[in-house]
Each structure stands twice: as C-alpha cells, then as structure tokens.
Regions:
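Flexible, compositionally biased loop and terminal segments
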Residues: 1-175
C-alpha cells in the first residue's frame, strides 16, 4: 500500500487524541477497561503504520489533566495498563529504532509509571527512526503554565521574552 502514496505528501508529525475507547466499549455492552485494552491494540497498529509510512514524529494524547476526574478505580486500572504496555512494548520500540518521549505533568503519575517510563525513555533515547511522544497528565493550559513558571524560575527579563524564547520552554518543542 505504501507504493501508491506520494512520500512528499506524508506529514513529518501526526498527533492523535486518544478518545472514546470507554464509550465504544459501553456501546458494545462491555466494560470501559475492555475499550481501553482495545485502545492499546489500536496504538500498536497506529505506531506500526506510522513507521511503515515514514512518519518521523507521532504524538499520542493519551491521558489529559481532565482524566484525573475519572473514578479512582478507572484511573488505577489505566495506570496499570500504562505500566504493562510500556513493559511489553519496550523491546519492540528498541527493535524498530523508535524513541519514546513523554510530555506532561509526569510527577502527577504514580511512581511505578514514572519509573517504567523513565526506563523506556533511557533505553530508547538514541533511537532515530521515529519519535513516539506520549502526552500524559497533559493539557494545553498545563503546557503554557509550565512554560511560564520555568521562565519565571530562570528570572528572564521582559526584554528577553519573545516568541522564540517562549517556544524554547515548551515541552512540545522539537528535541
């Protein structure tokens, strides 16, 4: 199928908001976690497809700051699913030369998640075929507030602040 696609028209970066897994499962009379588990399979297929088409950057908005308002049991199950998925997929990321990055308020995640994500990011940091970015505990508001706090922390003057400088403080900047 990739033969018939004009590679000049393939974007370098694709961002996907992962939404609706729970609702999809409910419509089928299944549990929300059934939907989330199927979402993991969809992520695997999406990553494989992105690699096949030569996408350089794939960002998955996987868990927003709003998701913390869900029932604790669902959050705990999602965090366990995150840990097991990262554990299961790290070797595949390495084998396929895919780098994992994470953006968002990672310190809000359970320590077990932070540890597993850190391990995977360390093991894949030199991979160059594609960068897979997971946005976890992330929102646009969080992104802006985080950048502003870091600018203040670095004691930047009003004269120094420009669009270019501000961009350097965003977690979504290219790296």
């Amino acid at each position: 199928m990739t033969n018939s696609i004009d590679t000049k028209k393939i974007p370098k970066h694709i961002a996907i908001t992962m939404d609706g897994n729970g609702r999809w499962a409910k419509e089928k009379g299944k549990s929300r976690m059934f939907g989330h588990n199927n979402g993991v399979k969809a992520v695997r297929d999406t990553v494989e497809g992105a690699v096949e088409y030569g996408i350089q950057y794939l960002t998955l908005f996987a868990f927003s700051t709003e998701n913390w308002k869900r029932p604790k049991m669902e959050i705990d199950a999602l965090m366990s699913l995150l840990v097991s998925s990262i554990h299961d997929e790290t070797k595949t990321l390495i084998k396929n030369n895919i780098r994992l990055k994470v953006i968002g308020n990672i310190l809000q995640l359970p320590k077990k998640c932070q540890k597993k994500l850190d391990e995977c990011m360390l093991l894949t940091k030199d991979n160059t075929r594609m960068t897979l970015t997971l946005a976890l505990s992330y929102s646009g508001k969080w992104e802006l507030l985080n950048a502003i706090k870091n600018i203040i922390k670095d004691k930047r003057t009003e004269k120094e602040i420009s669009e270019e400088l501000f961009q350097q403080y965003l977690t979504t900047k290219r790296s």
